[in-house]
Amino acid sequence: MQAVGRRDPIFRAIEAMTALAEIFERRREVLARDAGVTPEQWRVLEEISTEHFIPSMFARSRDSSAAAVSKILRQLLDSSLVSAAIGRADRRNRRYKLTAKGNKVLDALRGSRQAAIEAIWTGFSREELAAFSMFATKLSDRIERYSRGKSARRAAAVR
């Protein structure tokens, strides 16, 4: 296997993807901040809006702790963006729902995101978008396979 140098197309592609990921993260932070929430609170608001929100499952899907999700929920409750009620079927659980204020914030976030999508993405041709999507999917799949293989090898080495 040959070493990858700084001028290599692979290295340049990695730099470009890293820059893209950082830009996406910064944009998400700006959109959230402009709406008065954090990116994490935005994710929870989006999930609550689906009406299938279960805090423990959300924490697991985000590789987060239940305590971290509880903290975000308390912040959203304190900000009057969500309300909580005891579950009908299982009184040990709470049902979370967006308040009118929470819906307004989420609508503003979605509107800002849609405006950004239209301003940035609509200038690309269908072919460019299809090629990018195909490449991104292949790259994601390869990274996932590599990560699973590494985890399996690490687990086997521990046994």
Language model regions located:
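N-terminal leader segment of winged-helix/HTH proteins
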Residues: 1-35, 100
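C-terminal regulatory/oligomerization modules of transcriptional regulators
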Residues: 1-5, 126-159
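Anionic, Ser/Thr-rich low-complexity intrinsically disordered regions
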Residues: 7, 13-16, 35, 39, ...
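A structural signal for well-ordered alpha-helices, especially hydrophobic packing surfaces
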Residues: 21, 106, 140-144
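Charged, amphipathic alpha-helical coiled-coil/dimerization segments
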Residues: 25, 75-137
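N-terminal helix-turn-helix DNA-binding core of bacterial DNA-binding proteins
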Residues: 26-68, 79, 151, 157
